[in-house]
């Protein structure tokens, strides 16, 4: 396939009339964005990429509209590389690791409530400034609003046949070995550890690498992380970078700049594109890969983008060839589904360090394999699941949507933790542990009734018998309509329910 390497640069001042652009840009060498010539049987997927979103969805979509008007086409997908800030209402703000005086509702709540709808399919990963209580309802990802999809702690999905892998959060040495155990109500430290990446997620992503005898392919088309891969400045103009950000050089030399495990992920999975954010500067790099003889896989084109404010380079346009019959929609990646099934034994809601199969060392071996890449037989099992298209109609409000941002709306307690129907449906369909359920079962404290189940929500027919609802009888603190129950009978019933819940939690801890 012949290619022409070009730069598709997005003006960063918000004005797309060059005559009006008064900002002088001091730029790093630009990334080589591959604009492939369209051959027979191919078309282009037009993708917009932004760095940190910071809840500025109105501004981001408005900028995209200006670009579309200038270029004369419509974007098929928007990718956001973290700090998305999916804040549903003021109750989500205490779940963000941001000093209270800097917390702001921003504009996502309008898309959650239905006041607005995202004009383009939007895909995002989490960063270190997120509404963590909401996102931990969706460990494996899901819709946070119509047309806006969160990738979960780690994921690989497909868009128009392109394989997109993502890792949410940032690196912290003290938390990387732990399980995902955090949920509201967050302890003071847990509101930070909730967004720290875990070894178990990176281990799962490494299973996406090609077969051992495959030295030439690029198994992943696009890989996303909020953090930079540790060592990435060495593959770009580091002198320019350290001149612009003088504190970066010392961190880079000491190994503290970025996630030290992500470069291995690049070498294992050889993504064609690697997109990141977090450090609020646009920076490009090119990572070559070893091949076989004179042949090599395509290099990984790394690009990190800035935050969405005037004068900063926060958006980039990509055009990537896809099959002519490719549908511009999301679908589950069959290999990733098999990896989730293979590694299901690593899922727990207990606060514990997870010993990975490839890092067993001297501890007794509890795994019967170290390589969890799916076998042909395991992939065959996935085909039995049928259509892998991600349904677009499964979103439901768990926290109450904010219809109007009034002073009264600000006076609310922190959001509860909710059982999310998307997590329940996905895990039941795939046959894996439901971390959202396990986190709910850890404690009945701060577990709320999802808004869509409320009788006055207008989103569902209220059922007085909650056993008929998908989640069963033990998931929520609810009034089951026992009417004018005698005090002694009520006391006896509550004691029995308390015993049942305690026993159920103890049973889960043994899994």
From Swiss-Prot:
Disulfide bonds: none annotated. It is found in: Nucleus. Its EC number is 3.1.4.-. A divalent metal cation 1 binds at residues 52, 54, 280. SMART domains: DBR1. The keyword GTP-binding does not apply. Residues 473-511 are annotated as: Disordered. Its cofactor is Fe(2+); Zn(2+); Mn(2+). Transmembrane segments: none annotated. A divalent metal cation 2 binds at residues 83, 128, 226, 278. Binds 2 divalent metal cations per subunit. GO terms for molecular function: metal ion binding; RNA lariat debranching enzyme activity. It is an enzyme of class 3 (hydrolase). GO terms for biological process: mRNA splicing, via spliceosome; RNA splicing, via transesterification reactions. Residues 477-498 have a biased composition (Basic and acidic residues). InterPro entries: Calcineurin-like_PHP_ApaH (IPR004843), DBR1_C (IPR007708), Dbr1_N (IPR041816), Metallo-depent_PP-like (IPR029052). Keywords: Hydrolase, Iron, Manganese, Metal-binding, mRNA processing, Nucleus, Zinc. The keyword Lipid metabolism does not apply. Active in presence of diverse metals including Fe(2+), Zn(2+), Mn(2+). Binds two metal cations in two adjacent alpha and beta metal-binding pockets. One of its GO terms (cellular component) is nucleus. Residues 168-198 are annotated as: Lariat recognition loop. Belongs to the lariat debranching enzyme family. Cleaves the 2'-5' phosphodiester linkage at the branch point of lariat intron pre-mRNAs after splicing and converts them into linear molecules that are subsequently degraded. It thereby facilitates ribonucleotide turnover. This is Lariat debranching enzyme. It comes from Caenorhabditis briggsae. The gene is dbr-1.
């Amino acid at each position: 396939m012949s290619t022409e390497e070009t730069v598709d640069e997005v003006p960063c001042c918000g004005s797309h009339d060059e005559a009006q652009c008064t900002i002088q840009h001091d730029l790093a060498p630009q990334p080589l964005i591959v604009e492939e010539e369209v051959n027979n049987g191919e078309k282009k997927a037009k993708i917009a990429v932004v760095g940190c979103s910071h809840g500025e969805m109105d501004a981001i979509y408005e900028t995209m509209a200006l670009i579309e008007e200038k270029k004369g086409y419509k974007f098929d997908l928007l990718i956001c590389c973290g700090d998305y800030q999916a804040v549903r209402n003021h109750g989500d703000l205490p779940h963000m690791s941001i000093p209270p005086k800097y917390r702001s509702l921003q504009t996502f709540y309008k898309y959650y409530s239905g006041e607005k709808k995202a004009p383009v399919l939007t895909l995002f990963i989490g960063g270190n400034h997120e509404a963590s209580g909401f996102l931990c309802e969706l460990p494996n990802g899901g819709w946070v609003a119509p047309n806006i999809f969160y990738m979960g702690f780690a994921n690989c999905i497909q868009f128009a046949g392109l394989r997109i892998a993502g890792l949410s959060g940032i690196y912290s040495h003290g938390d990387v070995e732990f399980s995902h155990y955090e949920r509201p109500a967050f302890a003071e430290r847990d509101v930070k550890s909730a967004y720290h990446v875990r070894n178990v997620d990176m281990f799962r992503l490494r299973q996406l690498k090609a077969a051992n005898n495959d030295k030439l392919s690029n198994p992943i088309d696009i890989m996303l992380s909020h953090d930079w891969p540790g060592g990435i400045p060495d593959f770009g103009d580091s002198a320019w970078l350290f001149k612009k950000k003088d504190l970066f050089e010392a961190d880079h030399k000491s190994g503290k700049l970025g996630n030290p495990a992500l470069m291995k992920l690049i070498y294992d999975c050889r993504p064609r594109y690697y997109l990141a954010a977090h450090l609020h500067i646009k920076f490009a790099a090119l990572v070559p890969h070893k091949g076989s003889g004179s042949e090599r896989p395509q290099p990984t084109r790394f690009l990190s983008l800035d935050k969405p404010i005037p004068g900063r380079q926060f958006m980039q346009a990509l055009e990537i060839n896809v099959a002519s019959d490719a549908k511009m929609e999301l679908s589950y990646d069959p290999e990733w589904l098999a990896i989730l099934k293979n590694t299901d034994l690593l899922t727990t809601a207990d606060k514990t360090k997870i010993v990975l199969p490839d890092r067993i060392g001297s501890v007794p071996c509890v795994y019967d394999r170290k390589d969890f890449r799916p076998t042909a037989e395991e992939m065959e099992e996935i085909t039995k699941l049928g259509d892998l298209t991600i349904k677009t109609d499964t979103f439901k409000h768990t926290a109450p949507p904010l219809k109007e941002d009034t002073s009264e709306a600000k006076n609310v307690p922190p959001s509860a933790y909710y059982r999310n129907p998307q997590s329940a449906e996905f895990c039941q369909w795939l046959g894996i542990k439901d971390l959202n359920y396990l986190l709910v079962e850890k404690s009945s404290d701060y577990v709320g009734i999802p808004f869509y189940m409320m009788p006055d929500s207008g989103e569902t027919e209220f059922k007085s018998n909650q056993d008929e609802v998908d989640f069963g009888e033990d998931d929520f603190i609810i009034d089951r309509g026992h009417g004018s129950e005698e005090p002694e009978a009520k006391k006896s019933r509550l004691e029995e329910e308390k015993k049942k819940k305690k026993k159920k939690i103890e049973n889960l801890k043994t899994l």
